[in-house]
Amino acid sequence: QTAYLKAHYPAEYMAAVLSNNMNDIKQVTFFMEECRRMGLKVLGPDVNESFYKFTVNDENAIRFGMGAIKGVGRGAVETIIEHRKEHYYTSIFDLVKRIDLRSANKKAFENLVLAGGLDSIASVHRAQYFNMDGDGVTFLEKAIRFGAKYQENLNSAQTSLFSEATNETYQDLTIPNCESWTNLIRLKKEKEVVGI
């Protein structure tokens, strides 16, 4: 039966094998090489398409599971998936405004960025998320704080019966300019969190 599945449904079979071994980076690396040998396309993690485990998308490519990224827990993945049902995330600001930030901590965000999980949203490259704009705080940390403040004000406006409606608008933060990482640096950081 296994040989039949591997021969007739190779992408689905390998997605299941990868999901079954996703807690062991060495095994994931081994099976990713097997996918490459079989000619299967494996796409990196993506907050707009990935699930907790490895899956096969409409183009018959295997999508890396966010649960296989080191430091990204099930709670973070579940809140990302739950809130993208409305529509895909369009920017880091859209993401931090919508998801439950109690479930997705700073480390989860950092590792998602390093793994390429936010590459599909907006025109922010990975180095920009870690840019410290002279104040010792990364742009990613500022974005998370922005989302927390936005949610806090939204919740307090909803729970206060006698308060006047807040017309407070939130301008997205300025995305810092900086050099992109070289491919070597980007791949090295990616390997730290996904094993390949």
Report residues per predicted region:
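Noncatalytic, beta-rich nucleic-acid-contacting surfaces in large DNA/RNA-processing enzymes
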Residues: 1-196
